[in-house]
């Protein structure tokens, strides 16, 4: 059996059916204009999205050993790949901008695309990209703006979780912001109602009754007087004097400006946005030193790291190197210096690491002392302080019970 025949027999027989179910990927962010307006105008959405994007962009990547597998990008050296992922992806863009563009697409569109030209990495906007499935393998090609076709060995494809039309999707990712579009629209309608309510100069919850029959001219005159005397847009609020048998009473549930706050509903919408983006709400509301640190760690371990693992998995598949996220240089996860020093001191005194290794962990220069490069053997303070604990001490050798 030849190599090509072996490959043909190993292809997934069900791929043709999978391709027929979804021949071309579709955009899950179905209301991009609404999403864009919400990102630019709604504070909580802007803040949570930027927290995820900026936090993910702070993480670097570690390039490990090369796997013995067939990859799309051949001949790339470890140092070159490390430079592309951590210093400069291409001659025209810094690494922070590149990372933020990729994470933003993954967050808002559910997919991200990186173009590999053989020497550099370039971000390709996910909103304009389509994936065409293949009947035998996985992906046939990538189509950008219905004009440019990319081969599968030119695009690094990163896809978020998705469940479309009752089945998993291989080529479409689920936009995270799309899950809160309904909440954002309801929130916008509430605030628009409040704004129009005030702009129209409405008298809150007030209706006038009279036993007398007023003609059309008198009613219009009275309405004009009320609009002049009680207009929130102009700040008019004169004392209302009723005569001619007129009585005032509320006519709606909105009896004061406090009823227009929608505080509980707005808080519910804010919570939904935090849940969708995976941001602990305490990081936005503020807390104390006891709960801020655990929630920052929770945010990274449950939101940022899983997202970056999707990215590094695609990079590993494309380049063939073991690539992992590195959070060591993230300022928010830096351990307390005093606690770290005590921990390292304990490791040195118990013979786990050397003194200079501990200094290296603290970003200190090594000392030119022979003892600092040796493992310290702990003293047996419970016994005779010599030998191994449990094997020394007790009755002296050569003595008898009668001595």
UniProtKB/Swiss-Prot annotation:
Composition bias type Basic and acidic residues, residue spans: 394-403
Region (Disordered): 379-403
Pfam families in the record: Phage_portal
Residue stretch(es) of the prosequence: 1-10
GO biological-process terms attached to the record: cytoplasmic icosahedral capsid assembly; symbiont genome ejection through host cell envelope, long flexible tail mechanism
Record GO cellular component, one term: viral capsid
Similarity remark: Belongs to the phage portal family.
Binding partners and assembly: Homododecamer. Interacts with the major capsid protein.
Biological role: Forms the portal vertex of the capsid and plays a role in governing correct capsid geometry. This portal plays critical roles in capsid assembly, genome packaging, head completion protein attachment, and genome ejection. The portal protein multimerizes as a single ring-shaped homododecamer arranged around a central channel. Binds to the terminase subunits to form the packaging machine.
The protein's name: Portal protein
Organism per entry: Escherichia phage T5 (Enterobacteria phage T5)
Lineage, broadest ranks: Viruses, Duplodnaviria, Heunggongvirae, Uroviricota, Caudoviricetes
């Amino acid at each position: 059996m030849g190599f090509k025949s072996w490959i043909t027999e190993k292809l997934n027989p069900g791929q043709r059916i999978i391709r027929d179910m979804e021949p071309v990927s579709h955009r899950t962010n179905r209301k991009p204009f609404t999403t864009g307006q919400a990102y630019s105008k709604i504070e909580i959405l802007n803040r949570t999205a930027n927290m995820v994007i900026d936090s993910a962009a702070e993480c670097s990547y570690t390039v490990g050993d090369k796997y013995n597998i067939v990859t799309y990008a051949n001949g790339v050296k470890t140092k070159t790949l490390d430079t592309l992922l951590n210093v400069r992806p291409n001659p025209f863009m810094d690494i922070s901008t590149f990372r933020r563009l990729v994470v933003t697409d993954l967050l808002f569109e559910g997919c991200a695309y990186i173009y590999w030209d053989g020497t550099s990495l370039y971000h390709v906007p996910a909103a304009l990209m389509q994936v065409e499935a293949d009947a035998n393998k996985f992906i046939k090609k990538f189509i950008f703006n219905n004009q440019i076709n990319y081969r599968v060995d030119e695009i690094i494809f990163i896809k978020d979780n998705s469940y479309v039309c009752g089945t998993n999707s291989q080529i479409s990712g689920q936009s995270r912001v799309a899950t809160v579009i309904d909440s954002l629209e309801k929130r916008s309608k509430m605030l628009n109602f409040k704004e129009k309510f005030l702009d129209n100069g409405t008298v809150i919850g007030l209706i006038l009754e009279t036993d007398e029959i007023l003609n059309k001219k008198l009613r219009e005159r009275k309405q004009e007087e009320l609009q002049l005397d009680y207009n929130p847009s102009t700040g008019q609020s004169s004392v209302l004097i009723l005569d001619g048998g007129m009585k005032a009473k509320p006519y709606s549930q909105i009896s004061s400006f406090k009823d227009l706050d929608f505080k509980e509903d707005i808080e519910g919408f804010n919570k939904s946005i935090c849940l969708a983006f995976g941001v602990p709400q305490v990081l936005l509301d503020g807390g104390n030193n006891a709960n801020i640190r655990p929630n920052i760690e929770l945010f990274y371990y449950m939101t940022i790291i899983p997202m970056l693992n999707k990215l590094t998995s695609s990079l590993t598949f494309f380049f063939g190197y073991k690539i992992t996220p590195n959070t060591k240089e993230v300022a928010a996860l830096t351990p307390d210096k005093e606690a770290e020093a005590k921990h390292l001191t304990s490791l040195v005194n118990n013979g786990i690491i050397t003194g200079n290794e501990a200094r290296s962990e603290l970003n200190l220069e090594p000392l030119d002392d022979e003892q600092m490069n040796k493992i310290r053997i702990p003293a047996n303070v419970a016994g005779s302080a010599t030998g191994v604990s449990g094997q020394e001490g007790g009755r002296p050798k050569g003595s008898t019970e009668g001595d």
